[in-house]
Design a protein with these regions (language model features):
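Positively charged n-region of N-terminal signal peptides that target proteins for export
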Residues: 1-5
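C-terminal motif of bacterial Sec signal peptides marking the signal peptidase cleavage site
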Residues: 17-20
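Beta-strand-rich domains and repeat architectures in extracellular enzymes and scaffolds
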Residues: 35-53, 66-95
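Beta-strand C-termini and the immediately following turn/loop, strongest in propeller blades
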Residues: 43-49, 86, 91-99, 141-147, ...
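Signature of short aromatic-glycine-proline-rich micro-motifs recurring in repeat-based ectodomains
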Residues: 76-81, 129, 183-199
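Blade-terminus and WD-like Trp-Asp/Gly-His loop motifs, strongest in beta-propeller folds
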Residues: 82-88, 130-138, 198-206
Length: 229
């Protein structure tokens, strides 16, 4: 029998994402405009899939918010609000049951005021993912239409223009042979990834890893690097 693996990182991801919540969905909108300017880059599959899935999770889901910021009195904070800060920009959204966001807002901070730069409500976003590029000028968002969907999309956002680019993903499905332990019969199975994980390598390169909930030597995670144009 093939040995199956479930890494610590993947266990964390499962704890935060898997939810029998009736397949909640959002309204499929955002304030950005699809201009596709970041969609003409190139994909390169890596020889070995990344199994360090914890490295794709943000270390602090609540900020940290700079100590010298004075946020508006109605700004919510706490364990149920996802916050990420980059320079003078702050991303925030309510974390709902199952550890996901039904959209989020990006605002610019100045003198105690927040000015909305961008809002995302296209689909379900996992609260633990990292969003801002290192220089804070772009966002990367992995999302699905609902909590129980594996129809993944990746959207890049240029925060200087609010222009969106939905990337054309390479084939990230998993095809493997499954054997029935009782009958011994084998069949070929094709599955979409359970998880699609993102992290910025630098301002020009985005690392994308697709993984099943359980994997062995025949269905290791797939890792790709997307180089922006």
């Amino acid at each position: 029998m093939k040995r199956k693996y479930l890494s610590l990182g993947l266990a964390l991801v499962m704890a935060l994402t898997l939810c029998a919540c009736g397949g909640g969905a959002v309204n499929g909108t955002s304030t950005g405009k699809e201009d596709g300017k970041l969609a003409s880059g190139t994909w390169q599959q890596q020889e070995t899939g990344d199994t360090d899935l914890l490295s794709y999770s943000a270390q602090d889901l609540t900020g940290p918010i700079p100590e010298d910021w004075t946020l508006p009195s109605d700004f919510k904070t706490g364990d149920k609000v996802r916050v990420e800060v980059s320079g003078d920009k702050i991303l925030y959204g309510d974390i709902v049951d199952g550890g996901y966001l039904n959209g989020f807002t990006v605002a610019q901070y100045a003198d105690g005021n927040l000015t909305t730069v961008y809002e995302f409500k296209k689909g379900v976003v996992r609260s633990w993912q990292q969003f801002f590029s290192p220089d804070g000028s772009k966002l990367a968002v992995a999302w699905a239409p609902s909590t129980d969907s594996t129809e993944w999309s990746v959207t890049l956002v240029d925060l200087t223009t609010s222009g969106e680019s939905t990337l054309k993903l390479p084939d990230m499905t998993f095809t493997y042979t499954q054997t029935d332990e009782e009958t011994g019969e084998s069949k070929e199975v094709t599955e979409a990834p359970t998880f699609l994980l993102l992290k910025w390598q630098n301002d020009k390169n985005l690392v994308v890893t697709a993984s099943l909930a359980e994997y062995d030597s025949s269905k290791q995670p797939q890792t790709w690097v997307y180089t922006l144009p």
